């Protein structure tokens, strides 16, 4: 009755048997915490890379005690990301401890369960701390769309060559379209020009699209219009999130 009441108070299921002889549940929850923290670490890694001076697309929330430098007052260090990454780095070793404790003799073998509880407690604290820090990061993240667009334009349209190739391939055939765009890309790099300008002068492109060539190239080489399945993927993820919370 006490166990049932505790389970209800914590909104947890009541196991059919005691944990004394079933050590897998400790490893199971530890693995879940490690996976959660590892996922947060992946996000923190990407955010920290996006904060680099050369990229500069995002920044952690500014404020007193948030990423300032003792010697360089202009800096906004990714201290939140560092905290999450530190937790994610420690988690695999802690999870390994729980896995190592699985083959215990009899019930609650000496040393095994003592290692489990200390490890599980630490993993819970690390996961909770990483989750709390990431929540603050996302809520206050400073995003620079203009810098993102600048970075997209660094290749002068080359990253969108595939879009042109696919559209041109519908008229010329894929292999010929690939040849045209590949050759135009080389000329753009050699001449220091945009892919759009080089393609607009290409004989195959002009012959295929005629007076509409420049207009079509402008549309195809606009990165905001080349999102693929991204919007649908986001909708699917949000729908799955709502379904699991229901």
Briefly describe each language-model feature range.
Residues 1-104:
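Internal glycine-rich alpha/beta core junctions
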């Amino acid at each position: 009755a006490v166990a049932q009441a505790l389970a209800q108070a914590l909104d947890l299921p009541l196991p059919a048997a005691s944990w004394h002889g079933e050590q897998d549940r400790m490893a199971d929850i530890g693995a879940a915490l490690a996976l959660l923290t590892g996922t947060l670490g992946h996000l923190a890694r990407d955010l920290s890379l996006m904060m680099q001076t050369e990229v500069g697309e995002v920044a952690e929330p500014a404020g007193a005690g948030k990423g300032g430098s003792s010697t360089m007052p202009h800096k906004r260090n990714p201290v939140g990301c560092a905290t999450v990454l530190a937790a994610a780095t420690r988690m695999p070793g802690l999870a390994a401890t729980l896995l190592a404790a699985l083959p215990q003799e009899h019930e609650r073998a000496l040393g095994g369960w003592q290692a489990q509880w200390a490890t599980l407690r630490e993993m819970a604290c690390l996961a909770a701390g990483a989750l709390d820090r990431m929540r603050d990061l996302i809520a206050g993240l400073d995003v620079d769309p203009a810098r993102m667009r600048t970075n997209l334009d660094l290749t002068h349209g080359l990253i969108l060559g595939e879009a042109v190739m696919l559209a041109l391939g519908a008229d010329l055939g894929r292999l010929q379209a690939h040849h045209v765009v590949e050759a135009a890309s080389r000329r753009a790099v050699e001449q220091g020009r945009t892919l759009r300008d080089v393609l607009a002068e290409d004989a195959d492109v002009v012959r295929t699209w005629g007076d509409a060539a420049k207009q079509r190239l402008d549309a195809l080489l606009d990165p905001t219009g080349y999102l693929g399945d991204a919007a649908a993927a986001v909708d699917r993820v949000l729908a799955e999130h709502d379904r699991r919370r229901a």
